[in-house]
Amino acid sequence: MGQIKTRCSTAAGLFLILLTVIAGFSSCKSNQKDIIPSAEYAPYVNAYTGGVISQNSTIRIELTQDQPMVDLNQELKDNPFSFSPSLKGKTYWVSNNTIEFVPEEGALKPGAFYEGTFHLGDFVDVDKKLEEFNFSFRVQERNFSIHTDPITVTATQPDQVTVTGEIRFSDVVKKEEVEKMLTAGSEKNKSYPIEITQTDHPTRYAFSISQITKEAEDYQLEITAKGNPAGIDHTQNESILIPAKNSFRFLSAVRIDQPENGIEIIFSDPVSNTQDLKGLIDVPEVSSSIFQIKENKVFVYFETGKLNKLTLNIHEGIRNSQDKPLGTSHSISFSELNLKPQVEMATSAAILPDS
């Protein structure tokens, strides 16, 4: 269901709407104005669907008073809703005071603005001028972004790389559409299969590209997402460095806060889990730290307190799973304790009372 607008404590503030854009994927058109119902409807209408809604939403009207008798979940023969542009669908009572219009699949168009009319006078005794309740809503325009994780290299297959990530949408998209969007290949035009998995979040899909072979030299894996199969006019490209085989080196380090606060260090090869990392990796600004090795990644966990600067020192003596030393020391400074960016792609709306 879409955003439901609720009645404020004062009639004058009945349907004042604030659209809060959490990320840059809202597509409200400035030449189409939202319909703000009059406060005169306050005694009769408690809530309605409005603002920015999902393409899979239903449209609801919640009355302030229960109807004496309704046939729940049975389609109404006479549809009390009308829309511009026109929408096909069915109408049901879902409770004694809430009526719902269910659009046909695919009827709501991404980015479209709709004006709705609910024939309030069919259910409540009102003045003639209030017999029709007019409202509006917009359908979330589709967009997406790709987020890739650091590469994974295992001790059992040190010459193979796995790339994982997530593709995040502004609205619900079918898995078969996502599968047609993503491709991956190298400069040698080799194509790699991509496994797509639905996550617990309805607008996010995980992807995995495995058995990417290391070559004699570094090369770039190109991941391309074309939105056309999902009706999205957007393309995104991501380049992932695939390190050369037999080349153990430090790749990158990022601040993390999950599962605990710390730093994630990524190497080109799996790190030996038989060595003591104390003295080989240290953060001078913290009094104590805990190390965890996961294949080619080392996690350093610690409490930061009120620190505004961190230094990560990586000693050249660190060895990979084949006992080859790193050979070069590194010192990385984190001047600001910024974590990995958390990107949200949703639009929400809320009702504000009169000031």
Label for each model-derived stretch:
Residues G13-G24:
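Bacterial N-terminal signal peptides
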Residues C28-S355:
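Acidic, low-complexity Ser/Thr/Gly/Pro-rich repeat segments typical of extracellular/periplasmic
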Residues G2-F15:
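Bacterial N-terminal signal peptides that target proteins for export
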Residues S9, T20, N46-A47:
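Compositionally biased, low-complexity repeat tracts
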Residues R7, A23, Q32-K33:
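N-terminal type II signal-anchor transmembrane helix
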